Amino acid sequence: MLAKRIIPCLDVTLDESEARVVKGVEFVNLRDAGDPVELAKRYDEEGADELVFLDITASPEGRRTMIDVIERTAEQVFIPFTVGGGIKSIEDINTILSAGADKVSINTAAVKNPEFVREAADIFGSQCIVVAIDCRRNFDLSKGEYIVELEDGTKAWYEVVIYGGRKPVGIDAVWWAKRVEELGAGEILLTSMNRDGTKDGFDIPITRKISEEVNIPVIASGGAGTKEHFYEGFVEGKADACLAASIFHYREIGIREIKEYLAERGVQVRL
């Protein structure tokens, strides 16, 4: 069995020409968490398995990802490194991988043009292509394809949202996960907008459903607040990796502390 991965996420925005890491609740009310290069270095030293670097203002504002920051971060970091945000073309992917990233994460562009996933996977290899799926619970069951039972017994389906969670697109997240796997995605980064930034725990019902429906790794994202949440994400949610931002940025829990806790509870991690 492959070791489960712990992945800090750096949500980066441009502040008067300086890149800063920010974190908000459900993608709004963003607060400053520091310099991305310094944080990336710290996480590498603390035992993170990988990093995800999301330029969260790139898609909505149509701005290209901050290549200089990627280059500086890549120089300091020796673990695999994924970059997303505003990636719309093969040229964008080439630029980012050339700047030092190991993988790219595609979200909005994949929804608008699914063939982009296939083309990217054909050129760069599936191992470089992560499709990020942001989704939100929808209780109008007539519109969903895969109905998921929630923790309290109510039922919902999960609708894909794009542009940083701002625009619902009427696509079922489970159906979309299966589709991007067919198109050649090597991994899925799944964020439940219902949990993002809440620290209430990962959204187990949708994480488990998608993990069961696809054969590629699923990264659970949105809601991590305690060590137990990581255990739940791996064991109940069947995720291959768990991603978090604010609890790491503000030093609420250390990466090593989480890994030691998981190992004690029988989850295989890289210590």
UniProtKB/Swiss-Prot annotation:
GO biological process: L-histidine biosynthetic process
InterPro entries found in the cross-reference section: Aldolase_TIM, His_biosynth, HisF, IGPS_HisA/HisF, RibuloseP-bd_barrel
Major localization listed first in the record, in broad terms: cytoplasm
One matching Pfam family: His_biosynth
Catalytic residues in the record: D11, D134
Biological pathway: Amino-acid biosynthesis; L-histidine biosynthesis; L-histidine from 5-phospho-alpha-D-ribose 1-diphosphate: step 5/9
GO MF: imidazoleglycerol-phosphate synthase activity; lyase activity
Catalysed reaction, written as an equation: 5-[(5-phospho-1-deoxy-D-ribulos-1-ylimino)methylamino]-1-(5-phospho-beta-D-ribosyl)imidazole-4-carboxamide + L-glutamine = D-erythro-1-(imidazol-4-yl)glycerol 3-phosphate + 5-amino-1-(5-phospho-beta-D-ribosyl)imidazole-4-carboxamide + L-glutamate + H(+)
Keyword Lyase among record annotations: yes
Subcellular location: Cytoplasm
Gene3D superfamilies: Aldolase class I
Disulphide-bonded residues: none
EC number(s) on file: 4.3.2.10
Superkingdom to which the source organism belongs: Archaea
One cellular-component annotation, GO: cytoplasm
This protein's UniProt keywords: Amino-acid biosynthesis, Cytoplasm, Histidine biosynthesis, Lyase
Family: Belongs to the HisA/HisF family.
Subunit text: Heterodimer of HisH and HisF.
Chain's role: IGPS catalyzes the conversion of PRFAR and glutamine to IGP, AICAR and glutamate. The HisF subunit catalyzes the cyclization activity that produces IGP and AICAR from PRFAR using the ammonia provided by the HisH subunit.
Protein name according to UniProt: Imidazole glycerol phosphate synthase subunit HisF
Source organism (scientific name): Archaeoglobus fulgidus (strain ATCC 49558 / DSM 4304 / JCM 9628 / NBRC 100126 / VC-16)
